[in-house]
Amino acid sequence: MLDNKKLFLNKSSVNKLMKGLLNINQGKSDHISIPFISKPFIFKLIEQASNLHFRKAKTLVGNSVTQDFEVCFPAPRDGAIDTLATSIESLFLEAINSLDEPPIKSPKFNDIAMQRYVSGSVGISPHKDHKKYISVIIIVTLSGRSNFCVCEDRDGINAKISDDRPGNILILPATGFKVINNVFHRPIHFVNNIRDGRLSIGLRQNSEIN
């Protein structure tokens, strides 16, 4: 678990990530959720976020995706955010090096965004992350209560609520993730039912950035 001012990878986190990566590879799952961040370190991230500049996100983007939140992008990779990114990269490196045939290369996060939703926000409608994002996408909820769901289509059919409680890292496969039948589909997901607001951070590897 990642704690305040120190990086510590326990075997449990590594094993859960290894199992989760294999489950996605074998078509048994479409995401991973792992307890990883301590409450004191979450407070550090929230404190850093309070000093960042947020702007209103565009209401409509891409393939008719509706958004109702404020965003800080690009969020700086320094301070507690850098510690978080480095720690997750180390977690992946440890897990991937322990697999005989890892489905991805270890990610390097060069695209970081923070999102802030107010209570009662409609969230973000079902969508796929852009294909330029490779390996995995990491979502970390820092505060608030809401539903992060993975579904089958853009109508939200067969939505499954993921465990994105503060302290967990939520992992979605991205472009280049190897699956057993070689037919990979980027997960469709959305956020709704926002109570008490929501503050989250997303970490991605953008293939268009050197």
What are these regions (language model features)?
Residues 149-210:
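Catalytic core of Fe(II)/2-oxoglutarate
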Residues 108-118:
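A short glycine-rich, His/Asp/Glu-containing loop-to-beta-strand
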Residues 120-123, 172-173:
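Short Pro/Gly-enriched beta-strand edge/turn motifs at strand-loop
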Residues 125-137, 157-158:
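A short beta-loop-beta micro-motif enriched in histidine and acidic residues
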Residues 2-105:
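Non-heme Fe(II)/2-oxoglutarate
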